[in-house]
Amino acid sequence: FPDARERNLEIEYQRNMERYQFLKWGQQSLDNFRAVPPGRGIVHQVNLEWIASVAREENGMWMPDSLVGTDSHTTMINGLGVLGWGVGGIEAEAVMLGQPIYMLLPEVVGFELTGTLRPGVTATDMTLRIVEMLREHGVVSKFVEFHGSGLASLTLPDRATIANMAPEYGATCGFFPVDETTLEYMRLSGRDPEHVENVKRYLSAQGMFYTPDSETPEFTSNLSLDLGDVEPAMAGPKRPQDRVDLSAMKSHWHESLVAPIGHSGHGVDATQTGQQIEVVGSDGETYKLKHGDIVISAITSCTNTSNPSVMLGAGILARNAVQKGLKVAPWSKPSLAPGSRVVTEYYDAAGLTVFLNQLGFHNVGYGCTTCIGNSGPLEPEIEAAIDEGNLIVGSVISGNRNFEGRVHQKVKANYLASPPLVVAYAIAGTLDIDFEQDPIGTDSEGQPVMLGDIWPTDGEIREVMAEAITPEMFNERYSTVMSEPRWDSIPSEASDLYPWAPESTYVRLPSFFEGIQPEPDPISSIEGAHVLLNLGDSVTTDHISPAGAFPHS
């Protein structure tokens, strides 16, 4: 829907008003506490573009910036040279109240990057290769630090994409040191030039500013990757570390469909792989739905929407596709959910919004959507066809996780890909395609169109990026980020104590503290306790407590 963003924001306020009233009270009543209003972006991307200082001065003392957050992808900020990772809610609350974070000194794995990416290979492709390598190496509870001559070829958003996926490769964080690229991004995103210079002076004095001549630290173990070896790829169908070269996707899909149910198999009987169910869509169009058809195609998640190169690549590909007369497959549900309002600003400046809209990639809101299961419902006719034919249908998203059932309960094959590939697969409408051999569609003249005919060149992307993105754009958007009409109208008054509402079903006075004395009761023995869950490998909290919407039945 063209007005999806506004409609979704209205629904968000209706559903979460009690929470927002509580946060608004906190902003008015507590020192050093800010609440960014809803609809302004994903916290990790807003932090990257605006909040993080990299280093700061307090009471005459300079110190490095640092971060803990209650979402696992808090690690994204390590791309900016800010050490940060995800923690539990109680830990985060303790930090807010002035307590330290306690941790064991971690092992640090060195990851050397050399060379440069080949033309047509994206930051997403690189990140999926790094995820695969680090999962194989084993980095759980460890820090990863990136270094090497290859850093010079990576933009700050490229680094943020890699850092964002630290939970997927299993590390506590994936850290990039501060260098000239970091400072360039700080200037581009509208940070105060004097502050940027002070950051460099402070970190240089501390021996923490990275240059090509910096000595390689001593690590507990080491890996290396020549960026020139990275291939275009996707990851799936059920785990982010299961990378598949794009050139092998068609054969991979055929094997995955009939393989026994597991991390990469769907267990479809070989005699049923040709199953097709006729669907009459809500617009009256008739088509046949089959295994491998892509029913969700989403440019989503701060993992990639924070990176202008892949986002503009998707927009240019959309423009080229529309000019060829291509359309999104009628069974595919496209969506666009940027991580900040700056993305909309540079899409508009580049004249690409209209082409994304023509393909159905309307802006549905600034926040976590399809990657966390908030894709919204499929058309009832499509869901019915999936059930009738026991179809294994797919999604292609630019997110960071693809565990089975996370994106949508009806969608079993979920692949992570760059934003340009999301658009390409939405047009193709199926996983059963070899883009090197098979046309993506036919143009307005009935001639076959190959993906290479519409794929943007690196030069095109750089040219559009240079023209469309300016520091003024960041300054303008973030100058009003703390004000939103609905947020401003929420009734709330500052007070020393929160005025609990007895009728509230959402924000309630906890009963756990009733009867607590200054001296705690003696600790008693736990008897008769049993193991709640005993789980094998690759079982995640998504399997134990799934995200997303509750089914109607």
Spans of features found by a protein language model:
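Short loop/turn segments at secondary-structure transitions that flank enzyme active sites
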Residues: L117, E231-A233, H252, C302, ...
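Long, structured ligand/cofactor-binding scaffold of large enzymes
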Residues: F1-L113, D125-L128, P232-A235, M249, ...
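Mobile "lid/hinge" segments at catalytic clefts and subdomain interfaces of large enzymes
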Residues: R34-G39, Q45, A52-T211, D226, ...
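Conserved, well-structured core segments
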Residues: S297, V422-Y425, V531-L533
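Flexible inter-domain linker/hinge segments
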Residues: P2-M61, S189-R191, E197-G284, V449-L533, ...
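Short conserved micro-motifs at the rims of enzyme active sites and ligand-binding pockets
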Residues: T122-A123, M234-K238, Y347, R406-Q409, ...
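Short hydrophobic-aromatic micro-motifs
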Residues: G174, L532-L535
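A short, polar/charged loop/turn motif at coil->beta-strand junctions and beta-hairpin connectors
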Residues: L105, V140, F219, K290-D293, ...
